[in-house]
Amino acid sequence: MKFPNAQATVYNDTVVRQFAIMTVVWGVVGMLVGVIIAAQLAWPELNLGISFLSYGRLRPLHTNAVIFAFGGCGLFATAYYVVQRTCQVRLFSDKLAAFTFWGWQLVILAAALSLPLGYTQGKEYAELEWPIDILITLVWVSFA
């Protein structure tokens, strides 16, 4: 039932759209790296003798890109879309939502640069160095 004087809520779909687009972009990048390392299993010479193109350096990049970049962006997009509509309110702060978007993209970019260069903690699914971990914490706390 609609009330005659009720105003329609205007949602912040900008951040939802940004995260949705980057979900596709990072999904393609992550899957492409996966195809490259799968091909390297059959043809090891595909790394061209370049250390940052080796299987051992690209595999952490692939797993982190698919889990954190693709999965994380999809999670943020879904959460920002669903919460606004189920609660029927706009996001608390557009600037905070923008920070989560740009902060998360910075996390992904830092991971994409550091992992092939070999800067890791050497722990499966927790390879990222501590400065990136701090940025991840800041983004997730601001999201909460």
Name each model-derived stretch.
Residues 123-129:
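Membrane-helix interface and helix-disruption motif detector
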Residues 4-18:
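Cytosolic juxtamembrane amphipathic/interface segments immediately preceding
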Residues 6-10, 53, 122:
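A generic structural signal for ordered alpha-helices
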Residues 1-5, 141-144:
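Juxtamembrane interface elements at the cytosolic ends of transmembrane helices
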